[in-house]
């Protein structure tokens, strides 16, 4: 039937697979059996070798046993001899030890007496030093307590001073002055501290610092502080009110207009003014921003820039660079004039060197002419006189004077072209 063919084929395949599996297993078992046979043979050989080694070890053990018995007998004999000698030595040492004990006891008594006396002396000395040091320590502790009490009073006074409006303001002014002094700017030239001026309506203004920038620019710094910046308690509301009052006061003072008017009267022309509100610490800036997040925006709208020590140092560094560059540009004409004088002095030196060279040339030429005349005329007559029998004595006559000549040549100027020569524009 047709459906039996697949079943038969499947059965044949399964049977074939079983035959292959059985064949593979048979081969595997044969291989394992052969391997085990080889291992068994190797183990048998190893057992024979081990038996031979065992026999050899037993023989060595017997030999060592005999040696041990002999050594034990020898040890027993030596112990017996040692006991006898020890007994005789013990009797002799007993007598000697008795005498030594008496002597050592006497020496020990003497040493104990000396040690006791020395110890008592050292204890007395140490006790005296300890008492004196203890008294000094008590005195120092008393003085330290007084100093601590005084320091506590001073700290309280400083804290109260900083918590007062005047003390906080002085702290900001002192910090500002120290930063300006360490910035490298020149006092009374690049900046002025505590500049007082009178407004048009006879009012008094006193900015903490003025910094004169190039190109008619002016930087005004006014330090502001509050006791709430120093106080550790959370006074965000009071701090915000105080700093906004300072900002309003600074904006109403109108520093820019009044300072420009005052300085222009003194023939100092300034066009632009930048106003800085200086706070004594970076933490103070963070406290103000935390108390009033819109404080910076309010200040910027009034053309006032709140800064701490770090921000002020950055602006002062840039200001110093501008001032130095402007000073260098102002000294440009002076530098040109000094270079012109230097070139003129170089020309004068060249004239003098030319004259010295001419004089040297004339001197050497005249000397050469003198040497030629001396060698040709004078020395020939001296030789003739010497041939006539007149001796010069101990002095040897010179053979001839050396002659010198100067070779003059025009110096050549070597020009080297630069890779990137600077372009110089001539100004008429």
Swiss-Prot record:
Pfam families reported in the protein's UniProt record: RmuC
Keywords noted in UniProt: Coiled coil, DNA recombination
Origin superkingdom: Bacteria
Keyword DNA-binding among record annotations: no
GO terms under biological process: DNA recombination
Coiled-coil zones: 32-126
Disulfide bonds: none
UniProt function note: Involved in DNA recombination.
Family the entry assigns: Belongs to the RmuC family.
Protein name: DNA recombination protein RmuC homolog
The encoding gene: rmuC
């Amino acid at each position: 039937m047709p459906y039996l063919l697949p079943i038969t084929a499947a059965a044949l395949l399964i049977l074939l697979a079983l035959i292959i599996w059985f064949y593979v297993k048979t081969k595997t078992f044969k291989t394992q059996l052969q391997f085990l046979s080889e291992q068994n043979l190797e183990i048998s050989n190893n057992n024979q070798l081990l038996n031979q080694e065992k026999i050899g070890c037993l023989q060595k053990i017997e030999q060592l046993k005999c040696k041990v018995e002999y050594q034990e007998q020898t040890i027993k004999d030596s112990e017996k001899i040692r006991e006898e000698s020890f007994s005789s030595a013990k009797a002799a040492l007993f007598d000697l030890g008795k005498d030594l004990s008496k002597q050592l006891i006497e020496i020990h008594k003497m040493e104990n007496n000396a040690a006791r006396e020395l110890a008592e002396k050292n204890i007395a000395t140490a006790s005296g030093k300890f008492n004196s040091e203890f008294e000094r320590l008590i005195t120092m502790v008393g003085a330290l307590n007084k100093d601590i009490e005084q320091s506590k009073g001073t700290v309280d006074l400083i804290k109260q001073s900083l918590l007062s409006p005047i003390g906080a303001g002085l702290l900001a002014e002192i910090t500002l002055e120290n930063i300006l002094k360490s910035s490298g700017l020149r006092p009374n030239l690049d900046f002025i501290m505590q500049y007082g001026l009178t407004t048009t309506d006879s009012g008094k203004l006193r900015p903490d610092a003025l910094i004169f920038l190039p190109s008619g620019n002016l930087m005004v710094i006014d330090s502001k502080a509050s006791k709430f910046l120093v106080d550790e308690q959370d006074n965000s509301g009071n701090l915000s009110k105080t700093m906004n009052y300072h900002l309003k006061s600074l904006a109403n003072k109108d520093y820019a207009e009044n300072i420009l008017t005052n300085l222009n009267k003194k023939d100092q022309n300034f066009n632009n003014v930048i106003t800085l509100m200086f706070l004594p610490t970076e933490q103070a800036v963070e406290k103000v921003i935390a108390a009033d997040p819109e404080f910076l925006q309010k200040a910027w709208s009034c053309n006032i820039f709140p800064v701490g020590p770090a921000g002020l140092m950055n602006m002062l560094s840039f200001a110093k660079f501008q001032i130095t560059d402007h000073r260098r540009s102002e000294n440009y004409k002076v530098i040109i004039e000094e270079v012109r004088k230097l070139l003129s002095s170089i020309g004068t030196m060249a004239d003098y060197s030319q004259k010295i060279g001419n004089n040297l040339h004339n001197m050497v030429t005249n000397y050469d002419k003198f040497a030629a005349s001396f060698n040709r005329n004078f020395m020939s007559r001296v030789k003739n006189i010497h041939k006539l029998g007149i001796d010069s004595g101990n002095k040897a006559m010179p053979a001839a004077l050396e002659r010198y000549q100067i070779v003059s040549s025009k110096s050549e100027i070597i020009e080297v072209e630069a890779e990137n020569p600077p372009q110089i524009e001539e100004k008429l």
